[in-house]
């Protein structure tokens, strides 16, 4: 249901620090759309739409 920072760092082959920035950015977009977000996690469907569409 959610990807964690560690999973995103592994998939994108980036540092954990960069993965946190990506997650924060995606969660900021979700908040603007009215969704409740969880720090350090991003919904799998939303992540896949943004990175693998």
Question: In which residue ranges do the predicted regions lie?
Answer:
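Amphipathic, hydrophobic secondary-structure cores in small proteins
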Residues: 1, 9-10
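Residues within the helices of the helix-turn-helix
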Residues: 5-6, 45
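Absolute protein N-terminus
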Residues: 1-2, 53
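Major-groove DNA-recognition helix of helix-turn-helix-type DNA-binding domains
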Residues: 11-48, 52
């Amino acid at each position: 249901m959610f990807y964690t920072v560690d999973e995103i760092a592994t998939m994108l082959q980036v540092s954990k620090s960069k993965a946190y920035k990506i997650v924060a950015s995606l969660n900021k977009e979700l908040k603007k759309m009215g969704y409740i977000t969880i720090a350090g996690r991003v919904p799998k469907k939303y992540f896949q739409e943004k990175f693998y569409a």
